[in-house]
Amino acid sequence: MQDSVMQRMWNSAHLSGGNAAYVEELYELYLHDPNAVPEEWRTYFEKLPAEAGTSTDVPHAPVRDQFVLLAKNQRRAQPVATSSVSTEHEKKQVEVLRLIQAYRTRGHQASQLDPLGLWQRTAPSDLSITHYGLTNADLDTPFRTGELYIGKEEATLREILQALQETYCRTIGAEFTHIVDSEQRNWFAQRLESVRGRPVYSKEAKSHLLERLSAAEGLEKYLGTKYPGTKRFGLEGGESLVPVVDEIIQRSGSYGTKEVVIGMAHRGRLNLLVNALGKNPRDLFDEFEGKHLVELGSGDVKYHQGFSSNVMTSGGEVHLAMAFNPSHLEIVSPVVEGSVRARQDRRVDATGEKVVPISIHGDSAFAGQGVVMETFQMSQIRGYKTGGTIHIVVNNQVGFTTSNPVDTRSTEYCTDPAKMIQAPVLHVNGDDPEAVLFVTQLAVDYRMQFKRDVVIDLVCYRRRGHNEADEPSGTQPLMYQKIAKQPTTRELYADALVKEGSLSQEEVQAKVDEYRTALDNGQHVLKSLVKEPNTELFVDWTPYLGHAWTARHDTSFELKTLQELNAKLLQIPEGFVVQRQVAKILEDRGRMGVGAMPINWGCAETLAYATLLKEGHPVRITGQDVGRGTFSHRHAALHNQKDASRYIPLQNLYEGQPKFELYDSFLSEEAVLAFEYGYATTTPNALVIWEASSGDFANGAQVVIDQFISSGETKWGALCGLTMLLPHGYEGQGPEHSSARLERYLQLCAEQNIQVCVPTTPAQVYHMLRRQVIRPLRKPLVALTPKSLLRHKSAISTLEDLALGSFHPVLPEVDSLDPKKVERLVLCSGKVYYDLLDKRHAEGREDIAIVRIEQLYPFPEEELAEVMAPYTNLKHVVWCQEEPMNQGAWYCSQHHMRRVASAHKKELFLQYAGREASAAPACGYASMHAEQQEKLLQDAFTV
C-alpha cells in the first residue's frame, strides 16, 4: 500500500512522537494566523484533507475542529525543550525581531548628529547582526518583519537592516522607547519607519525651507557688517532654528491654534524676533544704535525684550508672543507656562489646542538648571498643565567656554532630564534642514495628539564666541578650526537643491538678494505677518495703564449681600461629611455672618474672595497647602470624610460666576512662583495669589522676585498684579520658620514698583485683597501674613468693618488716650503690636501711644504725619520690631519715619527697639526667644 502523506511525515526525524506537542502548537498557530508559521509548514497544513475521503489517511476534520477549539480557548500545549524542536530559522527569526527593537531603542547612538563630526561615539554592539548570532550569510534570507512599518510582512535581513539604519542611524536620532504607553511608542515607530526618517518634500516646501535659512543667515551677516563687534548673541551655526519655529507656528495654526507663546534666552533671539515674529528690522537697528525707545523706566538690552504680533497660517490668524526674559537661564520657561495657562483659561481651552507654548533652551542650561526639572514636573499636574510644551534645545555643544561633556553633565545627552516625564526626544543634525523639518512636524503632531511635552534636540554649533566680542579659539581650538572650514547650513542646502535640480543657482541667489534689499529698506521681512492684526487675540491692558498710587477705589461692599455670600459659603452638599474640627470652624463662621461672633482672619479672607467673584473677578490661589492653609485657617476646600471627595464652596456661589481656582501646588517655589507671575501678567482682571507654606521658603524663588516681580515693569513695562502671601512672625519656632525676610523685599522697593503690606486685622486683609483688584493699578503685592494672629483673641473685626471700611496704610491708636499726655510714640508692624498692647495694658501706661504701619511701601508718610499730629507733647519716637536690627524694616524704612518725626517736631530722634543684629533670622531655643522678646518690648517703652 502506498504510504500516506502522514505516514511519510511520521517517518521523518522532526515529526517523531516526541515532537507531537510542538506540531500541535504550530498547527494551532496556523489556525489562528496562517502567516505566523514558516512557509513549509503553512504549505503542508494547507494540503491536509478537510474531510474523510478515499485517502488512507485518518480523517482530519475532527482533529482540525479540536485544534480550532484549542485556539479559541487559548490553551497551549507544552512543547519539549525549544532547543530540541525549534528550527534554526525560527531561532533567527526571534533574533531579527530583537534586532529591530534594538535599533528602535539604541539606533540614536549610531546616528550622525554632529554637523562638525567631533562626537566620538562607538556604535552599540547590539546594533550588529553578529550580536544576535546572525552572519552575512543570512543577509538575503527572508524574515517576517513583525511590527516593523516598512510596508512588507516579509523582507530579507538586508532589507530590514537597510530600513532600520536609514530610519534610526542617519541624521535623526529618536528616543521614544522609554515611554511607558505603547500607543505612543507605536505612533513614533510608525511615523518614522514608514518614511524611513526622510519623507519626500515638494519643490515648494524645499524652496520655503531655503528661504527661511536665507533669512536666518542674511540677518546675521547684515548685523555683523553694520554693527561689527556689537553683542547680539547670534544664531550663526544654528540657523535651522528659524525654520523650526516657523514650522511649529504654521503647523499649529493648521490645527486651529490661535496663540503661540515663546520663551527663550539670548542666543538667536534677535533673529527670531525679526524672522519668525515679524519685528521691523528698523526698530532693531534703532536698538543697536542705542536710541532710547522706552518712555519710562530703565529699559533693558535688546536681546531681553519681548514682542508680540499676528501671523497668517493655513488655519487662520495666530497671535505670537515672545516673553520678556532676564539673563538668568531657563527661568522664563515656567513664566511662559503660566502665561499660556492664563490664555487657555480665558479661551476655555480645555484641550490646550488653541494656545501652544514653545520653550527654547541652550544645551548647557537645559542640563544644568534645576528649574528645568521643576517645569517638566508641572507638565501633567492639573493646576499647571498646558497640553504639552514643544521644547527646542539649541545644542551648539558649548556653554560659554565649557564644551567637554564631562564638565557639563553626568548624562549621555543634555536632553536626558526630559525623560523624567517620559517626553520623547528627537535629536537632529542641524545641517540637514529636511530632517529638521520632519522632526518638527513630528513634534507638533505628537503634542497635538497626546497633549504631552516633546523635545527637539537641534544639534548645531556656535560659529562665533559666546558673544561677538569674544574669541573662542583660546578654549576650544579644535572645534573652531573645524568651524572655520564648515560651510553654512544655507550653503550646504542650496548646493544640494541645485544639484538635485529643485532650484537653479539664480533662484538661490535671488532669495539672498531679496532679503538683503528688504533689510536695506527697513521693511518687514516676514511674509506671513498680518499688518492689521485682529485685536481680539490680544490681552487688553488698556484699563490698567497710566494710573497712580492715589487712584480712587472703593472696597466697601453691601452688608446684606456680604451676609448672603457668607451663608452660601456654608452650604454643603447633602451627605457630605466634614471633619469634626472643620465643622466647628464652619459653625463659627455662620455665627460670624450674623454678627454673633467677631470676624476672624479665615472668615474675612474667604469673604474677600467671595465678594470679588460676585463682582466679576476671577480668583486663582496656588501654593503648598493653600486649600486648608498651612496653619489650618482657610479651609476653602472641604474633604468628605466618607469618600475623600472634595467640595469648594467658592466655586459654587452662583450660576455663571467667574472661575475660582484653588490648587495645592507640588513642592516647588521657583517654578510655581514664576508660573503665577506669568499667569498674572496675562490676566489683569483677576486676583492671582501665590502663598508660601512659610514665608521663610519664598527665597527658594529669589530669582523670580529679583528679575521679574520687582523689576519687570521698569525693565520691560510689564505690568503685574500678582499677590504673594508670606506667613511671617516670631513665635519661637527657630530660624527656619520665623521670617519671610521682609528686609529683602523692602530693599527692592524703588520707583513705586511693588507694594509691601503687613496687615494685622481681618478687615485689613479683606480690604487689602479687594483693593488689589478693584483699584485699576497693577503692581505686585507682597503681604506678610500672620500665624498666631489667625486665632488671636484681639485680632478680630466686625461685619461693619468689612462692609463699610477700607484699607488703612496706617492704623492709629485704638485706646482712648489723652493725646496731650502721650510722650512716647511706638511705631511697629505686624504681630509685635499685640504684644506691645498687652504690655501697656498690664502696666497701665497712658503716656505711650502705639501706631501700626500696615503698608511699608510705598511708605505712607502723609498718613503717618496725620496720625501723629494730635500728639503735641511727644518726647520719644521708637520703631519696634521683632526681627534683628540688620533685618526687618529698620534699615530700609527708618529714613521715612525720621522724615515724618522731624517734620512733626524737629528735636525728635527715631530710636530702635528690637533684637540685636544676627546672622540668622531667629534663635532656636524657646527660652532665649522669650528673653529676647521681653527685652525688645521693654526697650520699646524705655529706650
Swiss-Prot record:
Reactions it catalyzes: N(6)-[(R)-lipoyl]-L-lysyl-[protein] + 2-oxoglutarate + H(+) = N(6)-[(R)-S(8)-succinyldihydrolipoyl]-L-lysyl-[protein] + CO2
EC class name: oxidoreductase
Keyword set, alphabetical order: Glycolysis, Oxidoreductase, Thiamine pyrophosphate
Coiled coil: none
Cellular-component GO terms for this entry: cytosol; oxoglutarate dehydrogenase complex
CDD domains: TPP_E1_OGDC_like
Requisite cofactors: thiamine diphosphate
InterPro entries: 2-oxogl_dehyd_N, 2oxoglutarate_DH_E1, DH_E1, KGD_C_sf, ODO-1/KGD_C, THDP-binding, Transketolase-like_Pyr-bd
Purpose: E1 component of the 2-oxoglutarate dehydrogenase (OGDH) complex which catalyzes the decarboxylation of 2-oxoglutarate, the first step in the conversion of 2-oxoglutarate to succinyl-CoA and CO(2).
Quaternary data: Homodimer. Part of the 2-oxoglutarate dehydrogenase (OGDH) complex composed of E1 (2-oxoglutarate dehydrogenase), E2 (dihydrolipoamide succinyltransferase) and E3 (dihydrolipoamide dehydrogenase); the complex contains multiple copies of the three enzymatic components (E1, E2 and E3).
Protein name: 2-oxoglutarate dehydrogenase E1 component
Primary gene name: sucA
